[in-house]
């Protein structure tokens, strides 16, 4: 079901890359690659998570994120604890919660890929409309 949904999104949008957490994603990665998508591993540690987490927090504070008040996303965001390392890096974490945060971590990963492989020009669609969650 998820792969078919991603395929339909690929028909509507120019999906350049799909980031994935290496844990337990082997079959889905192979299937998405077989469908022609470029998939890239994305670590869940401070090194990979800190820059896009900081950027997303900045966009939220600037009120440049539109999520439509989605109740599941809101619930997952409420489950997040922002962990900080001694160097000042941050990342979303469940701390000791057993509740889900995946839907709140996915936009962090997607934002990183949008920044890394965004437009070739210096202009960004996010400069005018902000970040949109679908």
Task: Indicate where each model-derived feature is located.
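Active-site proximal helix-loop segment of RNase H-like, two-metal nucleases, encompassing DDE(D)
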Residues: 55-64
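RNase H-like, metal-dependent nuclease domains and their acidic two-metal-ion catalytic environment used
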Residues: 1-44, 50, 54, 67-134
């Amino acid at each position: 079901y998820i792969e078919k949904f991603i395929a339909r999104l690929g028909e509507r949008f120019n999906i350049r890359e799909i980031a994935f957490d290496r844990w337990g994603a082997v079959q889905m990665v192979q299937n998405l690659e077989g469908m022609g998508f470029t998939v890239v591993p994305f670590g869940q540690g401070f090194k990979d998570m800190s820059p896009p987490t900081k950027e997303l927090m900045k966009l939220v504070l600037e009120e440049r994120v539109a999520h439509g008040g989605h109740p599941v996303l809101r619930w997952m965001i409420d489950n997040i604890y922002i962990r900080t390392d001694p160097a000042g890096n941050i990342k979303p974490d469940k701390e000791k919660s057993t509740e889900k945060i995946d839907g709140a971590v996915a936009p962090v990963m997607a934002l990183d890929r949008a920044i890394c492989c965004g437009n070739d020009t210096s202009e960004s669609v996010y400069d005018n409309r902000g970040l949109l969650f679908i």
